[in-house]
């Protein structure tokens, strides 16, 4: 045979064989419907598979779904532990680098793979797989196909937990539940990593299956009694051999026990599982969670985003943060919600906070932002998936959702770090869900109040700054310049607005993450104008500051510089001796500089306590420049930003003479403004539904009320710091504060260690040293006192009393009271608003410990509110407060404090008398009217017979600048109390005059009328 003859024969034989293959393909059943595939298979395919397989494969290819165009089939291999997997597709063939890890995570060992091309653009890949144990293809094929599709489309994850597919009957969706709960366990602070959690589940497949069985029994609609399933789960857990595995699995058990709702059974518009899992827990029922535990917690999980939302109560509000703390963002959110609970003591909702992470953020900036928005949308949808709706005033629960809790329709969100521009996105999703709150769901959107435009947060914090300066005898708005160090830049809301609020600001230095601005001897007028220019300039930085306006020795320096030369002017202004410093050290020196004010409007924690470590602070980016509270030499700190100091750092600074409050006190204006916006929109939605108002008119009305809303908000920013000033002036109240804390602890409302409040032994030392609590400590206790009173009022029928419901008109702007007051009583939160208004009014005026003292006297906090209301109205206290506060910068601030305390003492004596004589609050209007008339008559008699009361007090106050009429009214308060007490003690009207004459004689003998 000639050379080359054999190959010719082989080719001929192969062509003959292929022709036979095509003929046999055409003769098979259904071949007519598959005609396009008759010649589509490659030579390699025809060599490997008979025509009958070609028909079956062609049918599979023809039936490929549009998205993704994938399918798979399983067949037995050469032995019981081997399977043949065919993967079908269209377009670009599947990458082995993606397929192999997917299969290996499921538990397969891939022995070989053979690809085949099929015209025009189909492909097939055959994998030879071995298994740890024998398994029938039909037992796993459909679950494997579903898993492959969902992993391929990024609808679920590919990791070791998917090995449960082969050793249990769980499907990929059920495994996703275990994965999501496992990731929550890590965020909850359990001492396990994800590898340990996967190992525990994979090593105990029966327990894993029992977990899912219990999940279905409890949460599947129409599932019935879950008792048996949980009993079986307990049995399975007792059989686990490894102590670590059992501990991990018991975390799962605890989560299922505390689980209230899930969206697992909900479907999207196409009838498919949703692209996220959401779980709502009764957090206080999860033993392993760190304190403080919120009331409710929602965990949202998907392959692209993880998020958590913590709520302190059923009516709660707070921002959603785009976190960069992937490993422990729940810890970050827990710290924020603790602060939010304290901050929200002045508003209707209690505190909530949410946070989410983008799990695989792209490097490109624009793509990064789009990924963040997409993850935010998923997070918001996960929250709304588990939230009840209101339709025509009736609760409508989420579809296909078992609820193990009460109706829960109130969910509002706000902006936070990273989500400042996302409110409209949230409201669009609320509209998609037809959520009852509409665009009140996320405040600050395009039809809401622009916090930066109003400057509400900075203006609120500035009320604290002005008060601190008044107590130092300075009027910074009119006469007195002051030096300041700033944290932030002029493009920021809080920093920028704050540095425009006084023409007397001498900003010596400021820093942000990019620059250090130094102006050792600024001209107040010129620098104010330049700061205003930067504030108006989009995306400005300190580098945009006109260098010609910076004083000698100053400049703008990059934080990336190796060192910064210290000019003589800088040395003098900031008490620096070195000739040069690294940027981080220069910032530390600025924070320690002897200035009047540190104004914090930035992000980061810059001051801690000397006994705290940087790791405890949890802000690694600022470790190099952070200082201790005892090293602060500024006279005042204004906390426009959040978390600028640790609480222990605040306390240490206060104990070393720095005047400050807390961030929750200073910057509460933002959350208060948002709450007003939400409640106004809820009110006006009623008018819209009644046809009295359309959306355009509502938006116009919202804009018209901007100044009025700001005025309402700033009122609390004035009153709360005033309450702290009064508390600091009364050191003798320390025992009352101690007993209040003990009471709150007894009711499991307060954990002193968490809130950095002193224990009884520490309080004893302060008492011996004649020390008080510091302002930061009092600020926390103020919030807890308000929360305690609020809860008692809300649980009573007091908010429904007609007299107290009149306070709704005080809460809302006057424009609403004039035209839409009829909707106030039917407002969804009318009881909460009334309780909040009463709580703020009473605690701000009577002080932090008033609630405890009243509870000891009568044990009835609602009765305290009624008696306080009677005392306030019969004393005309509101007018007196207004006149005292009008004396700001006219008389010494210490005199104002003295007068406020005199008025408070009068009210407390009156309340005690009303309680002692059992005065009812059933008809407040009649009681107040009757007492007012009688008191007026008795005072008229006294003045006619005896003249003015306490003339020496009146004269002393006038000498300090107090108006004569106000001095006279305040001097008459003791006589006014005696009139009230005489009326209450009188047996009847006939004896009242005689009793009053006896009282006047006694008072004259005591020098009342000298």
Task: Please identify what each model-predicted range represents.
Residues 95-104, 108, 175-184, 340-356, ...:
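Hydrophobic/aromatic-rich, well-ordered segments within soluble, folded domains that form packed cores
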Residues 159-165, 177, 190-199, 225-228, ...:
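Short coil/turn segments at secondary-structure boundaries
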Residues 1-2, 84-88, 165-166, 179-183, ...:
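Short glycine-rich or small-residue beta-strand-to-loop segments that form or flank ligand, phosphate
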Residues 4-6, 10, 105-110, 114, ...:
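Extended active-site and interfacial segments that coordinate phosphate-rich ligands
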Residues 33-36, 227, 231, 235, ...:
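Long, K/E/R/D-enriched contiguous segments that form extended
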Residues 362-363, 372-377, 384-406, 419-1010:
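Non-transmembrane, aqueous-exposed alpha-helical and coiled segments at domain scale
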Residues 1-108, 112-304, 316-323, 367-371, ...:
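Non-catalytic interaction/regulatory segments
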Residues 69-76, 86-88, 98-100, 116, ...:
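Generic recognition of flexible, low-complexity loop/linker segments
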């Amino acid at each position: 045979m000639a050379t080359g003859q054999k190959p010719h024969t082989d080719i001929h034989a192969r062509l003959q064989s292929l022709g036979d293959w095509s003929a046999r393909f055409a003769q098979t059943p259904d071949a007519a419907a598959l005609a396009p595939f008759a010649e589509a298979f490659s030579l390699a395919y025809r060599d490997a598979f008979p025509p009958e397989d070609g028909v079956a494969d062609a049918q599979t290819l023809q039936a490929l779904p549009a998205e993704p165009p994938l399918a798979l089939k399983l067949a037995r291999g050469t032995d019981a532990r081997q399977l043949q997997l065919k993967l079908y597709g269209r377009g670009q063939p599947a990458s082995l680098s993606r397929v192999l890890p997917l299969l290996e995570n499921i538990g397969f060992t891939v022995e070989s793979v053979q690809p085949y091309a099929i015209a025009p653009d189909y492909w097939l890949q055959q994998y030879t797989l071995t298994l740890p144990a024998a398994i029938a293809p039909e037992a796993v094929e459909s679950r494997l196909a579903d898993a492959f599709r969902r992993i391929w489309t990024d609808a679920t994850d590919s990791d070791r937990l998917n090995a449960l597919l082969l050793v249990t009957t769980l499907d990929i969706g059920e495994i996703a539940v275990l994965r999501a709960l496992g990731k929550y366990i890590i965020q909850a602070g359990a001492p396990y990593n994800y590898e340990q959690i996967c190992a525990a589940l994979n090593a105990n497949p029966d327990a894993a299956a029992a977990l899912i069985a219990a999940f279905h029994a409890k949460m599947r609609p129409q599932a019935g009694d879950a008792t048996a399933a949980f009993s079986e789960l307990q049995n399975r857990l007792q059989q686990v051999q490894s102590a670590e595995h059992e501990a991990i699995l018991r975390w799962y058990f605890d989560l299922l026990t505390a689980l209230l709702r899930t969206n697992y059974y909900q479907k999207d518009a196409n009838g498919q599982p949703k692209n996220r899992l959401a779980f709502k827990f009764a957090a206080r029922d999860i033993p392993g969670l760190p304190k403080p535990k919120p009331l409710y917690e929602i965990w949202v999980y998907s392959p692209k985003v993880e998020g958590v939302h913590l709520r302190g109560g059923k009516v709660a509000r707070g921002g959603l943060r785009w976190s960069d703390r992937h490993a422990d963002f729940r810890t970050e959110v827990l710290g924020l919600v603790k602060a939010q609970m304290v901050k929200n003591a002045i508003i209707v909702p209690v505190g909530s906070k949410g946070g989410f992470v983008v799990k695989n953020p792209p490097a490109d900036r624009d793509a990064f932002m789009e990924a963040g928005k997409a993850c935010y949308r998923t997070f918001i949808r996960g929250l709304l998936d588990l939230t009840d709706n209101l339709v025509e005033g009736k609760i409508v629960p989420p579809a296909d959702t078992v609820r193990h809790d009460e109706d829960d329709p109130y969910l509002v969100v706000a902006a936070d770090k990273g989500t400042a521009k996302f409110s409209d996105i949230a409201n669009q999703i609320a509209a998609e869900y037809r959520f009852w709150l509409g665009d009140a769901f996320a405040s600050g959107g395009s039809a809401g109040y622009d916090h930066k435009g109003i400057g509400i947060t900075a203006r609120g914090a500035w009320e604290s700054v002005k008060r601190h300066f008044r107590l130092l005898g300075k009027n910074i708005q009119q006469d007195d310049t002051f030096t300041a160090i700033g944290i932030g830049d002029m493009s920021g809301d809080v920093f920028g607005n704050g540095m425009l609020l006084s023409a007397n600001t001498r900003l010596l230095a400021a820093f942000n993450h990019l620059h250090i601005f130094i102006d050792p001897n600024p001209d107040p007028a010129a620098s104010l104008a330049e700061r205003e220019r930067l504030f108006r300039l989009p995306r400005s930085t300190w580098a945009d500051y006109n260098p010609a306006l910076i004083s000698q020795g100053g400049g703008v320096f990059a934080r990336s510089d190796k060192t910064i030369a210290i000019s003589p002017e800088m040395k003098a202004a900031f008490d620096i001796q070195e000739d040069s410093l690294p940027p981080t050290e220069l910032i530390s020196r600025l924070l320690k500089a002897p200035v009047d004010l540190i104004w914090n409007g930035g992000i980061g924690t810059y001051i801690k306590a000397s006994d705290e470590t940087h790791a405890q602070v949890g802000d690694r980016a600022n470790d190099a420049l952070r200082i201790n509270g005892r090293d602060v030499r500024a006279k005042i700190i204004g906390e426009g930003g959040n978390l600028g100091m640790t609480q222990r750092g605040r306390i240490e600074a206060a104990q070393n003479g720095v005047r400050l409050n807390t961030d929750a006190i200073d910057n509460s204006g933002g959350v208060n403004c948002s709450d007003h916006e939400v409640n106004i929109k809820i009110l006006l939605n009623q008018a819209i539904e009644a046809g009295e108002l359309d959306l355009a008119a509502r938006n116009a009305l919202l804009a018209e009320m901007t100044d009025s809303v700001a005025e309402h908000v700033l009122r609390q920013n004035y009153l709360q710091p005033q309450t702290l000033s009064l508390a600091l002036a009364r050191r003798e109240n320390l025992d009352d504060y101690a007993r209040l804390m003990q009471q709150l602890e007894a009711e499991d409302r307060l954990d002193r260690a968490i809130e950095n409040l002193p224990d009884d032994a520490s309080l004893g030392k302060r008492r011996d040293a004649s020390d008080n609590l510091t302002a930061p400590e009092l600020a926390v206790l103020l919030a807890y006192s308000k929360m305690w009173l609020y809860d008692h009022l809300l649980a009573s029928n007091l908010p429904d009393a007609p007299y107290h419901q009149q306070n709704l008109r005080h809460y809302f702007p006057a424009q609403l009271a004039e035209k839409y007051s009829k909707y106030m009583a039917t407002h969804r939160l009318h009881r909460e608003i009334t309780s909040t208004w009463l709580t703020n009014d009473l605690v701000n005026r009577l002080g932090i410990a008033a609630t405890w003292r009243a509870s000891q006297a009568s044990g009835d906090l609602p009765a305290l509110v009624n008696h306080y209301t009677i005392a306030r109205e019969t004393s005309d206290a509101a007018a007196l407060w207004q006149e005292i506060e009008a004396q700001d910068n006219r008389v010494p601030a210490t005199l104002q404090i003295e007068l406020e305390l005199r008025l408070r003492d009068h009210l407390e004596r009156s309340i005690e008398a009303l309680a002692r004589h059992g005065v009812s609050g059933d008809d407040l209007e009649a009681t107040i009217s009757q007492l007012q008339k009688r008191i007026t008559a008795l005072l008229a008699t006294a003045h006619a017979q005896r003249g003015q009361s306490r003339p020496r007090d009146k004269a002393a106050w006038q000498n300090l600048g107090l108006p004569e009429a106000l001095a006279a009214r305040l001097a008459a308060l003791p006589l006014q109390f005696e009139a009230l007490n005489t009326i209450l003690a009188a047996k009847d009207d006939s004896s009242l005059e005689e009793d009053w004459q006896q009282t006047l004689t006694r008072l004259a003998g005591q020098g009342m009328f000298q």
